[in-house]
Amino acid sequence: MEQDNPADRPDSPGEFTARAVVTGMLLGAALTPCNVYSGLKIGWSFNMSIAAGLLAVGAWRLAEKGLGARPFGMRENNINQTAASSAASIISAGLVAPIPALTLLTGTELAWPALAVWVFAVSILGVVVAAGLRRQMIEHENLAFPAGLATAETLKRIHGRGREQGARLRALLAATGVSGGLKLVLDLAVSVPRLALPGSLPGALPSLKNLGVALDPSLLMIGFGALIGLRAGLSLLLGAFLAWGVLGPWAVARGWAEAGAADGVWFSELVTWLLWPGVTLTVVAALTSFVLSVLKVRRGLAAEARMGGGLRGGYALALATVTALICVVAGSLFGLPVWVSVLAVALSYVLAVIAARVSGETGVTPVGALGKVTQLTYGVVTPGDMAANLMTANITGGAAGQCADMMHDLKTGWIIGAKPQLQIYAQALGVLTGALAGTAVYLVLVPDPAGMLMTPEWPAPAVATWKAVAEVLSAGLGAIPDGAGAAMAVAAVLGLFLGAADRMLPEHLARRLPSAPAAGVAFVIPAWNSLSLCLGAVIAAAAARCWPELTERYGTAVAAGLVAGESLIGVALAFRTMAG
């Protein structure tokens, strides 16, 4: 796609305007809770760029008509979506994975100011790395960065076609209202329990209710299922069947996992065993795919290495400043020696380069796999030190995730002719907003991580994964429960095969195989979540087949609204509970 020439567009006299920045920060603060909420529920988040663009242009169109405000231009909206998406992606800095995992393993809990500073430091490192990679990856090599392309096309459409913009915004807001209203009614007025399916599996001791096979009235899961696609949805269903329909009952029958109450859901009892094969499947597939991706893009990585040989003075100063910040904060909060933090920053730069390139070519950011690389590295460098293992991986994974998100935003800006340095400023302000809002929401949602996480209410699958890897690297194979070793071996073979197939087979064939990350997640979330996610994916696929034009135009907006409505009300209810 060719770059747009700013001189050809008289639509936006300003770019980095006060209203663009403030709008982005406010929307970022409002949308960040959605990703924190969904991250703790199912371990996934979604890009908020398009939602932020729609909401901003809708708000300023109203201000234009009612208050006489000047038109909100496309480049202004680009600054807005850059700040908002960077704020909402703050969960990659550890809020739904290594930070709660550290609490579960060591009891370490951080107050809001300290947690916000840590999350900001990790994320701003990713912003600095992205600033150094932009010219090579976007201008010289013109990597795709699919999310950035999609956002650019959306911005062009909504600023070029007023009716379509208004219709998509109304669809987004209507879905948000329905989802949020249902959540409010179910929590405050009418208690509608999950509809447990009757009966049991053939020859199985637990009932379907014990295994969590039920229909859940959650529109958030339906919406998220629509966003992740049919392949991931069906993979979740397959993973749920293997975990809760086969391995769970088998582990109970062999005495490897305890049975719960006869009329209850056995999630907490079974997940402590099931997470091991699930984590193995996810980690092995992710690392296999990651290694093959690196081999595929090795020429481009060599170009980045040559580029890094001569850092400009200003950029070198920024990188040194961020490194010093991380060393001070990591030492103060977690007792990490300076050399450990410096090594983590150096590793972050290398892995963020890889993450940005893989994301640029495939649209997938391998944050989880990169975190595991660091955990394995520090398992050797600092054996037995759980804080070092988790928080250095937090640095690399968080920096890589924020870097990749920034590259997609910079791709959007390049296409529409925006100034990259202004986007970098917007990204930094968004990170600040996300750090303050995201940490506050996290602390309100789970004030007692040890008692609330890895439960049916808050499954926190990413926490389970990071915690399990840290336990094995710290305590050795003795941390693995009885009988799980054989299941892990089978999962490792499957993960190796699926991870390799995902990178080596033609795309049309790879899409027909299960998604290992999705199947692995199903091992550590309740079965009813997997069923709802699959249902959402099937509904979206059917709609796309029957009404392709309508689905393309409104599908993402409706699905995003379903996710946003329930999660925002869920966060609001948590604040209400805290306030008494």
Residue ranges and their predicted role:
Residues 1-580:
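Alpha-helical multipass membrane-protein architecture
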